[in-house]
From Swiss-Prot:
Job description of the protein: Involved in glutamate biosynthesis in leaf. Required for the reassimilation of ammonium ions generated during photorespiration.
Protein name: Ferredoxin-dependent glutamate synthase, chloroplastic
Keyword Metal-binding: yes
Keyword annotations: 3Fe-4S, Amino-acid biosynthesis, Chloroplast, FAD, Flavoprotein, FMN, Glutamate biosynthesis, Glutamine amidotransferase, Iron, Iron-sulfur, Metal-binding, NAD, Oxidoreductase, Plastid, Transit peptide
Family: Belongs to the glutamate synthase family.
Any one of the GO CC terms: chloroplast
PANTHER family (UniProt xref): FAD NADPH DEHYDROGENASE/OXIDOREDUCTASE, GLUTAMATE SYNTHASE (NADH)
Residues at the active site: 97 (nucleophile)
Transit peptide, UniProt annotation: 1-52
NCBIfam families referenced in this protein's UniProt entry, alphabetically: PRK11750.1 (NF008730)
Protein localization: Plastid, Chloroplast
Catalytic activity, EC: 1.4.7.1
Main location (coarse class): plastid
Length: 1615
């Protein structure tokens, strides 16, 4: 085969940075190769590459690729009282990274190990982030053993005695920049050591090269020194480490009040390990720290870390590794973890501390990152006598339930986890953790396996772990083992014994240390299930009074409780939440309505609670949580509940448990002396009662508003306020671990309310009034008659209550999963909410640490709102039925809905008549509405004189900033979708395809229109020649439906939908009844088959993953801008910073009030935040971090007028999205039945007869947007501005409006009115800048080859070979884009045979088209074959290896994601989620991780080896064949949809054998060849997984021919 010069060079440059001067024997490659390599490094950072000459700066002309390509030869090593956690502070630091370690099993220190770690670090630069200067890294670092040779050399030169390795501690210290402060800090440090009896041997200034540091990092760079101390009073190694730990804690306490306290930081203080780190790019770490270039720096291991932080403000201490851990991930439950650790401070004791526990507090720091706090807790356990592996198992447990291997082979491991489940809440979230105490080095993965981790071992006794393969040059013949860490797995290297322990070996060793199983049997008890009550406990009048008093509405009962009782699931609704925020409403609201659920986006993924429930649990333990530092049977003395939702009998069981000593606290307050101050006083009394009860030994506090008879002057305290206040009070007084809180309440009936109570401290809830309402409903005459007449499914009274609780539990799992949290025990007290409308007084009392940006109600005002419900139950004219507040459905006299019938009618009149007067009436209607959104509290102002409107930019310019929302073709009809697209194209705006692809017929302008009709689009009217129905914005959503190479290359912009305003953190499902033949064709599925979109993108589990997808999309379509859609919530600014650094062109902020075709009511009402706050935070954060000019800011959510546009512009938005109102202008009548497929005007229906009623024409929407633009122009003229550019980011033109709200006058708008400055560029300049580039890429080299370009242009066949490295990402994506643009997805008749050798970077072979035959000899990272539409992709290991290919992990996670065609053959194992959302791809592999074939809708997958758990979850189409040689497959398959059967159909046998034959031919697989040789023996060992849509296919139906013949006979007979 012909080979390009790049591939032919024996020492082609490698991307590991020129981290160190190369050994003299190494060839120095300069010139073009070095420059190209430098440019490649810059593009790996996600920035536009500068001129190559500039890129070469700091490299010294040395090619880094030479490092990887040098022949490697191992040589023998030379022997020689704190406040609660505050969400604002926590959210300011989020991150992700690339990590790894190198370890020598002989424990022989070597400079080569350090060198290899730095090389690997340089090869993961693309996994890190940089600041706005493109030079200051987010952080990188290295942990190693202490380089004693280096330090003794220094000691010798200083005239000091040699350092004693057994009792010398070394501290790596960041000191204040100011010289005087530094000396003061050093004096305090030295004094603490001296006072502790340690001898300070000296200080060493760490040598560094400041010239390589970026500007931002240099400005904040500390003085970096090392301190050496002698520990004379201890001789045990662990005691020495403990003494050094105590000293560090004492130093922190001694310097706490110093002005320079935040500038003093110990990176490490140990006699075993040391950490070098900083705000540096990975490639310059070794250049900055000159020690790392010194060959005397020798260590038997090294952990390395590259950070990608969403916060770009340089903070040197937050670089990693930390003192024990290197963490790639995010802890979702951090606020709760910190609060619980604070609660433990009073009870943590251990003999090893010799009574000095009080000196090492606190154990957490809210100002530090989640990684730093996890490290701190792990270090506490380690210094208290736990091993690193045990500490990790306690803090980050695996999903041990539903784990057949553990339950059968390792029950002691399950006992260990069950024991600690009640002692330590899991630190939950995606995490790859590397750890070392200097004796053990290891790595573990979170329970969901949401970070990549590969490992390999060599014959010369080295073990490597890394986020990616290919980061270190390797002689493959020496590799004896290749593997990957799966969910919850661990690997450790014992440096003292040379043992490598893999997963269950580690855990069995730890779990066998104590008899945890017998302790559990001895002390832990469970509540036995208690039957539900079978009769009502109250009469109808009493129930009604209770419902009125506690805030129920008829909607709550009929649409929520009764639906849950009858169906066992949450009610679904549609459109968005268009009512006022609770604090702005004139109607009374329950306290729960002031809280919005937070959710995962970008930095961590949501979870699918339906298809991945095996990793989730609602179990909770009740009782005292004792001393975590000691073990024993008494710690297991608790009660286990299977869920937090109790019926009356189960609550009674808890109350009868004498060991718990339960105390019931009444939650009423007395208003006989007036309301003012009464609620505050009652809360204080309640907290005092709780305090006394716990001090007297109570382990269970039951807060109850249950009463025999309600009293008019004794209203109930809002139960959420009571729970939160007691929870916070007990934390502050060190009592929280001593008791659990249970709520016995009438105030809880929706899943959101349960979640709030649990999130603020309740362990369980008994919703007695909701259960009574279920009983009353079931026994009502209306319900009985409906069931008797068959109009409602028959349920018993017990079943109604069981259904209700089932729905609550399902809803709780969904709420947890939105945030990526798996365990209710971790969610409890984690405060995963944002508050809208409560003042600081209320927040500090009960919700301390939660974000409440706009202030709001005082305690007295909250008391008045509570009382407004209560008095209705006792007034003389009390209604005989519950009031309908109209919170869900618009109704006369109910709550105001922005999308109301009158508004729709006025807008229809204006756009259909093209009447300025009618639009003015529409404007007046909006202006006269009640306060509905935050911007209604603001008005525009100007110190300029008005100008003639003729001087203002034209409407045609303004409308170019308008976009419509991403509405999928499937959720809405084809007519609506196309009419909107045509309208937006006419005005130069942009429509959005939504999920589901696009018909290619829409990509060409119409030229056949007569009288408004076109044969091309016969279902539309009002057309014009030249119209195009394409959507300028093509959406890439989690399901990847319709995402093909041709779809992407025909996009002007590509939107990555991370979240949707109406249901953030959730996926979706298009019901089978909406999947018509047309929809199925576009989505590469079958008609009538339900199509599931996962909650997360399965290639976006972190910020660096998002950067990779952005890279992939820029790769296939370098002309399309990439936008990322986020939903407003606290912390969105830091997320947006990360998105900007990830090379996005556009960031879209969506408000909570956006529309949806279908969503649970609780999500519509209680998730996401106002776009005003989200936009302000995003704009200001980007300005502060110097990133605003990089991205266009787009905002949407409830836009209806030009005033909305102007408000958004003043807050910083460049472009503006319209969703629901665009549908209304096109014909929507707001019937709010989108989710039923029964839209009366065919806007949101796939039913042909309803679609025929569609009234809209594109011109209506054109008219609307021109009206809005003219409104903008008129207002700009009044304000004295000539163009929108002039006001963007100008918050100074906003002022608070004088509005008298019904509930409070304490709304604080300063957050919206504050300014961080203006961008350096105008909005028009930002919008018109070029698409962000990936920089030089390997695909450009491929396309530059004349043979390949000729083959593409003239459809010929060509064969080529190229070298590939892990920094070569999305390889072949650009080539595929060129082919797709020219020939479409199936039109290329040529053939490109391209072979790569080496280790491929992420997304290898993405978006392949037919005619591309790609072969990789080596290995690959994650996302192989992503989005491929055709072609062939083969991955095989190198010919000479030291491992068995079928046992080795050859490719990474999430391969074949969203494939719509082609074949993949992998000789070896793949990672998690192989073939996730595969549509039509075929594949053969030799083993997979968990979740294989998840959400698959078509195609065929063959696995010739073992698979992980949860196979075929959500699989609605396609077939899978899995070889089950050891009879272990059955419990691993998710049988909710698919059925398992042997391969009996002849067509199925032919399909299976044919694929294996092709596989063997392409890969040379010995395993495959053996199967074919012994076909008759192996065939019975295969299982076929068949979803319902494939049951009648010839491959699955053994009697297909007979059935077909019978059907033919039946048809013939009928004739």
């Amino acid at each position: 085969m012909a080979t390009l010069p790049r591939a032919a060079a024996a020492a082609a440059p490698s991307p590991a940075a020129a981290l160190l001067p190369l050994p003299r024997a190494a060839p120095l490659l300069a010139g073009r190769a070095a420059a190209r390599s430098a440019a490649r490094r810059l593009r790996a950072r996600g920035t536009r590459a500068p001129p190559l000459a500039a890129a070469r700066r700091g490299w010294g002309g040395v090619s880094p690729r030479a490092v990887l390509d040098l022949p490697r030869r191992r040589e023998a090593a030379e022997k020689p009282a704190q406040k609660a956690a505050d969400l604002n502070e926590i959210l300011s630091e989020r991150g992700a990274c690339g990590v790894g370690f190198v370890a020598n099993l002989k424990n022989e220190p070597s400079f080569n190990i350090v060198r290899d770690a730095l090389v690997a670090l340089g090869c993961m630069e693309h996994r890190g982030g940089c600041g706005a200067d493109n030079d200051s890294g987010d952080g990188s670092g290295l942990m190693s053993g202490i380089p004693w040779d280096l330090f003794n050399d220094w000691a010798n030169k200083q005239g000091l005695a040699p350092l004693d390795r057994t009792n010398t501690g070394v501290g790596m210290v960041f000191l204040p920049q100011d010289e005087n402060s530094m000396e003061e800090a050093k004096a305090v440090v030295a004094k603490v050591f001296t006072d502790e009896g340690l001898e300070v041997l000296g200080w060493r200034t760490v040598p560094f090269n400041v010239s390589v540091v970026g500007r931002y990092a240099k400005e904040t760079m500390p003085n970096i020194q090392q301190i050496f101390v002698k520990v004379a009073k201890e001789d045990n190694a662990d005691d020495i480490e403990r003494e050094l730990y105590i000293c560090r804690k004492l130093i922190e306490r001694a310097t706490k009040s110093a002005s320079w306290a935040d500038e003093l930081y110990f990176c490490s203080l140990s006699s075993r390990t040391i950490v070098y780190k900083g705000m540096l790019r990975s490639e310059i770490l070794g250049q900055f720290y000159l020690d790392l270039q010194n060959e005397l720096y020798k260590s038997p291991f090294a952990i390395y870390h590259r950070r990608y932080s969403t916060n770009t403000s340089p903070r040197w201490p937050l670089a990693q590794p930390m003192r024990l851990l290197g963490h790639n991930g995010e802890i979702n439950t951090i606020q709760g973890n910190l609060n619980w650790m604070r609660s433990r401070e009073a009870t943590l004791q251990s003999p090893v501390w010799r009574g000095r526990e009080h000196e090492i507090r606190p154990f957490g720091d809210p100002k530090a990152s989640d990684s730093a706090n996890l490290d701190s807790t792990a270090e506490l356990l380690l210094r208290s006598g736990r091993s690193p592996a045990e500490a990790m198992m306690i803090l980050v447990p695996e999903a041990y339930k539903n784990h057949p291997t553990l339950s059968i082979k390792y029950p002691e491991v399950i006992d260990f986890y069950d024991y600690y489940k009640g002692q330590m809440e899991a630190w939950d979230g995606p995490a790859l953790l590397l750890f070392s105490d200097g004796r053990t080095v290891g790595a573990c993965l979170d329970r969901n396996g949401l970070r990549p981790a590969r490992y390999w071992r060599t014959s010369d006794d080295f073990v490597y772990v890394a986020s990616e393969v290919g980061v270190i040059p390797m002689d493959e013949s020496k590799v004896v083992m290749k593997g990957r860490l799966g969910p919850g797995m661990m690997i450790t290297v014992d440096l003292q014994t040379g043992q490598v322990l893999e997963n269950t070996e580690v855990k069995k060793s730890v779990a066998s240390a104590n008899p945890y199983g017998s302790w559990l049997q001895q002390s832990t008890r469970s509540i036995k299930p208690v039957n539900f009550q079978s009769s009502v406990a109250m009469d109808n009048e009493t129930v009604l009074r209770h419902q009125q008093a506690f805030g129920y509405s008829s909607e709550d009962v009929q649409m929520v409780i009764e639906t849950m009782a009858s169906q066992g699931k949450e009610p679904t609704f549609c459109m968005g939440d268009d009512i006022p925020l609770a604090v702005l409403s004139q109607k009374p609201h329950m306290l729960f309505d002031y809280f919005k659920q937070r959710f995962a986006q970008v930095t961590n993924p949501a979870i699918d609670p339906l298809r991945e429930g095996l990793v989730m649990s609602l179990e909770v333990n009740i009782g005292k949580r004792r001393n975590i530092l000691e073990v024993g049977p008494e710690n297991a003395d608790q009660v286990t509940l299977s869920s937090p939702v109790l019926n009356e009998g189960e609550l009674e069981s808890l109350l009868n448990d004498s060991k718990l000593k339960p105390k019931v606290l009444s939650t009423y307050f007395d208003i006989r002396k007036g309301l003012d101050g009464s609620l505050d006083k009652a809360i204080k009394v309640l907290c005092d009662e709780a305090d006394a009860a716990v001090r007297n030994g109570s382990q269970l506090l039951v807060l109850s508003d249950r009463s025999e008879a309600l009293e008019p002057t004794r209203p109930a305290i809002p139960i959420l306020l009571a729970v939160g206040a007691i929870h916070q009070h007990l934390i502050q007084n060190g009592l929280r671990m001593s008791a659990s809180i249970v709520a016995d309440t009438a105030q809880c009936f929706s899943t959101h309310q349960f979640a709030c109570l649990i999130g603020y401290g309740a362990s369980a809830i008994c919703p007695y009034l909701a259960l009574e309402t279920c009983r009353q409903w079931r026994l009502s005459n209306k319900t009985v008659n409906l069931m008797r007449n068959g109009k409602m499914p028959t349920v018993t009274i017990e079943q109604a209550q069981r259904n209700f609780i089932k729905a609550v539990k399902s809803g709780l799992l969904k709420i947890l999963s939105k945030m990526g949290i798996s365990l209710l025990s971790s969610y409890c007290g984690a405060q995963i909410f944002e508050i809208y409308g409560l003042g600081q007084e209320v927040v500090d009392l009960a919700f301390c640490g939660s974000v409440s940006k706009i202030g709001g109600l005082t305690l007295d005002e909250l008391g008045r709102e509570t009382l407004s419900f209560w008095v209705k139950a006792f007034s003389e004219d009390t209604a005989k039925r519950l009031e309908n507040f109209g919170f869900i459905q618009s109704r006369p006299g109910g709550e105001y809905h922005a999308n109301n019938p009158e508004m729709s009618k006025l807008l229809h009149k204006a756009v259909r008549e093209k009447s300025d007067n009618a639009y003015t009436v529409y404007q007046q209607h909006l202006a006269s509405r009640p306060v509905n959104v935050l911007r209604d509290l603001l008005e525009l102002k100007s110190d300029r004189a008005p100008i003639p409107i003729g001087k203002v930019e034209p409407a045609t310019s303004i409308v170019e900033r308008f976009c419509t929302g991403g509405m999928s073709l499937g959720a809405i009809s084809r007519e609506t979708h196309e009419a909107i697209a045509i309208a937006m194209n006419r005005i130069g705006g942009k429509s959005n395809s939504g999920e589901g692809g696009e018909d290619p017929i829409r990509w060409s302008p119409l030229a056949d229109v007569e009288d408004g009709y076109s044969p091309t689009l016969p279902h539309l009217k009002g057309l014009q020649n030249g119209d195009t129905a394409t959507s300028a914005i093509k959406q890439v959503a989690s399901g990847r439906f319709g995402v093909t190479p041709t779809f992407l290359v025909n996009a002007e912009q590509i939107e990555i939908k991370i979240a949707q305003g109406a249901k953030p953190g959730e996926g979706g499902q298009l019901p089978g009844k909406k999947v018509s033949a047309y929809i199925a064709r576009l989505r590469n599925s079958k008609p009538g088959v339900p199509l599931i979109s996962p909650p997360p993108h399965h290639d976006i589990y972190s910020i660096e993953d998002l950067a990779q997808l952005i890279y992939d999309l820029h790769q296939i379509n370098p002309k399309a801008k990439v936008s990322v859609k986020l939903v407003a919530e606290a912390g969105i600014g830091t997320v947006a910073s990360g998105v900007s650094k990830g090379n996005a062109d556009i960031i879209q902020i969506s408000g909570h009030d956006g529309g949806t075709g279908a969503s649970p009511i609780s999500s519509i009402k209680h998730a996401g935040g106002p776009w005003e706050l989200g936009l302000s935070e995003t704009h200001q954060t980007l300005i502060q971090n110097g990133l605003r000019e990089r991205v266009v800011l787009r905002v949407d959510g409830g836009f209806r007028s030009g005033l909305d546009v102007l408000m958004a512009a003043a807050m910083g938005a460049d472009e503006y999205g319209f969703g629901s109102v665009a549908m209304i202008a096109t014909g929507c009548v707001m019937a709010r039945i989108c989710h039923t497929n029964n839209c009366p005007v065919g806007v949101a229906s796939q039913r042909e007869e309803l679609r025929a009623r569609f009234p809209g024409v594109p011109g209506d929407l054109v008219n609307y947007f021109l009206f809005v633009a003219e409104e903008v122009r008129a207002t700009l003229a009044q304000l004295g501005f000539e163009k929108l550019d002039d006001i963007i980011g100008r918050t100074d033109i906003l002022k608070a409006k004088h509005v008298s709200l019904a509930k409070t006058q304490h709304i604080d708008l300063k957050y919206l009115l504050s300014s961080a400055g203006l961008p350096k560029w105008s909005s028009s300049q930002i919008r018109s800048q070029d698409v962000h580039s990936n920089g030089p890429v390997l695909d450009e080299t491929i396309l530059a080859d004349p043979d390949i370009s000729d083959a593409i242009e003239n459809e010929k066949e060509v064969s080529k070979t190229f070298q590939i490295y892990n920094v070569d990402r999305a390889v072949c994506g650009r080539v595929a884009g060129v082919i797709a643009k020219k020939y479409g997805d199936t039109g290329f008749a040529g053939q490109l045979n391209i072979t790569f050798t080496g280790s491929a970077g992420q997304s290898f072979g993405c978006f392949l088209t037919p005619g591309m035959n790609i072969r990789l000899v080596g290995e690959a990272n994650d996302y192989v074959g992503k989005g491929m539409a055709g072609g062939e992709l083969v991955v095989v290991p190198v010919e000479k290896t030291g491992f068995v290919p079928e046992d080795a992990a050859i490719v990474g996670n999430t391969c074949l994601y969203g494939a719509t065609g082609g074949q993949v053959f992998v000789r070896g194992k793949t990672g998690e989620r192989f073939a996730v959302r595969n549509s039509l791809g075929q594949a053969v592999v030799e083993g997979t991780g968990d979740h294989c074939c998840e959400y698959m809708t078509g195609g065929c997958v063959v696995v010739l080896g073992k698979v992980g758990r949860n196979v075929a979850a959500g699989m609605t189409g396609g077939l899978a064949y899995i070889l089950d040689e050891d009879d272990t497959l059955v419990p691993k398959v998710n049988k909710e949809i698919v059925k398992m059967q042997r391969v009996n159909a002849p067509a199925g046998q032919m399909q299976l054998k044919g694929l294996i034959e092709a596989y063997v031919e392409k890969t040379g697989s010995e395993k495959g060849a053996t199967i074919l040789r012994e076909w008759e023996a192996y065939l019975p060992l295969f299982w076929q997984l068949v979803p319902p849509s494939e049951e009648d296919s010839p491959e699955a139906c053994a009697e297909f021919e007979r059935v077909l013949a019978k059907q033919a006979t039946t048809v013939q007979s009928a004739k």
